[in-house]
Structures are given as structure tokens and as C-alpha cells.
Amino acid sequence: MATSSTFSSLLPSPPALLSDHRSPPPSIRYSFSPLTTPKSSRLGFTVPEKRNLAANSSLVEVSIGGESDPPPSSSGSGGDDKQIALLKLKLLSVVSGLNRGLVASVDDLERAEVAAKELETAGGPVDLTDDLDKLQGKWRLLYSSAFSSRSLGGSRPGLPTGRLIPVTLGQVFQRIDVFSKDFDNIAEVELGAPWPFPPLEATATLAHKFELLGTCKIKITFEKTTVKTSGNLSQIPPFDIPRLPDSFRPSSNPGTGDFEVTYVDDTMRITRGDRGELRVFVIA
């Protein structure tokens, strides 16, 4: 056949080809580069198996060096994971220096809102009906949009301690047990005292029970407040603060509250309060 003889004329003698697989002869390397036929189409009939491998090897080299295949697409879960990781870092960089929102300006609030919405959109709708265990654990409050306005951004069940005595707020946590349905708001506080007494350091735990409403709304019901002193008074055992009777409880503090979980993964959680308060938590 003409095609076979033409192809054979391009190949060197078998001994020369078999003697050096690492550097195929130039005639093979350049004669195959313009061909568009399959790599194995013309080798099997005239070249022994070992020479066929050597020729195929040089053909692959030419193909990669000349017209390379397109890189694999980054779409799918891998690309989504990278995008979400970048958006999480963006949100953290926006809110990390705001002292949980206490020193946030109007511009800071807007930047935090935009960064949170981008992450919420990328994460998609939250459905906790089969994944309630995503809430399990102790979460540290990193940011609250309500703190900048000195508002708590919605109804807050529990004792209105801040109205009775001056309180300086420290770290705030949420401890959630999806099995017992316990939902504890834990706040490190410093209670003011008249001079010359030092302020009282304590940890207040507002115990609740929670239930899931729909796919992502959490309703909490207040049960009790427990205080554990620290510092010089750490030897005092924990004690409960009596719950106010319903007749004395202000209308803004009905004993229940709710919020929506708008984003959650293994390390971060975003919630929206019943008055739109944005909160960002990280796993403790």
C-alpha cells in the first residue's frame, strides 16, 4: 500500500529506534506533528510493538507541546468549595476587627451585610430537617449588627439584667445540643460595683429549649439564668436568678424568640434575627 510504504520511509531502521527510547529520532518527532489522525492509526501495521511505543511516546510529546488539551473545568463541588472558602475569608476579614460589632460604623455594617449575603447566596438555602446536627457544638459570636446600635435586634428571652445594673459584655457563645434540644446563650460579663469595690466578673448562662420550625427557623424558649462568678469570687458555687413572673415581664421580653439559619457549615454559622439582626458565629 502507498500509505504504508510512505510511512515506513519516514521511520529509521529498527535497531536505531530500539537503541534509544528516551530521544526518538527527529524524523519521527516532526513528521507526526501536523497529522490529525488518531495516534495509533498507522503504527500497528509496520512497526514492531516496542518501536510502536517509542513512536507513540514521541507523538504524545509533539501533541502536548503543540496543541494541548484544555484544562479540566473548575465547575462543580470543587469550584463551589473554593468559592465558599474565599467568601468566608472575606466575611471574616470584614467583621474580625469590629469587636463583635460594638465599634462598627455605618460603612462597616454595609460591608458586613454585603459579604454575608454573598456567602448566603453561594451556600444556597439551608435545610436542617435532615441535618440538624450541623448546629451541634459550642459557637462563638464573632459579629452582631445589633451591637453597633446598642440594640439586641429582636426579642431576647431572659432576665433584663442590663436594665438593672451596669454590665460590660465579654465573649458570647451559643451552646447547642441537638439531642436534648438545649440551647444556651453564654455571656462573659463584668458587673459594675460601687467604689471602692472591684467589678464582679461572672459567666451568665441563659438556658433555653429550642425547636425547628420549617426548614431553617429556630424557636427558643427561655427557662432560667445561671450565674457563675470568677476571679476573686470563683469559689462561690453557681446560682440561678429567679425568673420574673409573667405580669412583671416587659412586652419586649415574652420568654421566646426565633431566628433563621441562613448559612451553616462545620466552622461557620450565619443567622438572621426576628428583626433582621445579622449574626456571625464560628465554632469554638
UniProtKB/Swiss-Prot annotation:
Phosphorylated as part of a basal defense response. Disruption phenotype: Increased susceptibility to ozone and to bacterial disease. Keywords: Chloroplast, Phosphoprotein, Plastid, Transit peptide. The modification Phosphoserine is found at S96, S105, S148, S151, S155. It is found in: Plastid, Chloroplast, Plastoglobule. InterPro entries: PAP, PAP/fibrillin_dom. Its main location: plastid. One of its GO terms (cellular component) is nucleus. One of its GO terms (biological process) is chloroplast organization. Transmembrane segments: none annotated. Residues 1-72 form a transit peptide. Residues 1-47 are annotated as: Disordered. Residues 1-11 have a biased composition (Low complexity). Required for plastoglobule development and resistance to multiple stresses. Regulates plastoglobule osmiophilic content. May be involved in the transport of lipophilic antioxidants in and out of the plastoglobule. PANTHER family: PLASTID-LIPID-ASSOCIATED PROTEIN 4, CHLOROPLASTIC-RELATED (PTHR31906). Part of the Photosystem II light-harvesting complex (LHCII). Belongs to the PAP/fibrillin family. This is Plastid-lipid-associated protein 6, chloroplastic.
